[in-house]
Amino acid sequence: MVTDKLLGKQSVMISLDVDGFLFDRLNQITKAGFNLVEINSTDVKLFTSIKNQYPNLKIGASGVISTSELEECYNAGVDFASSPGFLPSIAQTASVYSMNYFPGVATVSEAMAANSLGFNYVKPYPATLSFCTLLNKCMPKVSILPTDIEFEEIEHFLNLPSVSVVVINNPDIKQLIASMNATQSIA
């Protein structure tokens, strides 16, 4: 796992739902200069199509809830995967494949369990500013990727030292441009 290399200097990950606008959004994301995209699906045919059409994007699978889904996504060539919660079996399978994996956590105990298995990046879900502040305080060496946050709260989350990347869902082109500007002003 080379998570730091995967995330790079980009502080915003784009999360996209699978709908009729998916490929339009992927075009907008590419034009806006983002390259870290999480697709809310585990459909391996979809990932193959996206990876072929957008070879410069780092594509992740979101919503992984079983080891078999994780293995299928890995075999489809996704760059990373995440789950809405934490299951040791999924985390251990990701470790076996040396796969970039971001376990979802809803409690400090889940973050501790993920960290004890070697995962230094977690996705609080749901990500509230108060929960992320608590994780930042209790586990300052764990990097936090707040998920599905409100666009207007990006700067608040990025001001927490443990937050390395924020995840915004289905942004429009204006939000993409504003996100790029906001993250550049913080950096």
Which sequence ranges carry the predicted segments?
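Conserved N-terminal beta1-alpha1 strand-loop-helix module at the mouth
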Residues: M1-G77, S95-V96, I173-A187
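Catalytic beta/alpha-barrel core
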Residues: S15-V18, F34-D43, K58-I65, V78-L87, ...
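Short, well-ordered alpha-helical microsegments
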Residues: L22-F23, V44-T48, T67-L70, L87-A91, ...
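Catalytic cores of alpha/beta
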Residues: R25, S66-D79, S109-G118, E150-S164
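Glycine-enriched alpha-helix->loop->beta-strand junction motifs that scaffold or abut catalytic
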Residues: A32-N35, Y54-L57, N75-A81, V96-F102, ...
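Glycine-rich phosphate-binding active-site loops on the catalytic face of alpha/beta enzymes
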Residues: F80-I90, K123-F131, P161-A182
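Strongly charged, low-complexity linkers/loops
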Residues: T133-K137
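Hydrophobic secondary-structure block in the mid-to-C-terminal portion of proteins
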Residues: M139-A187
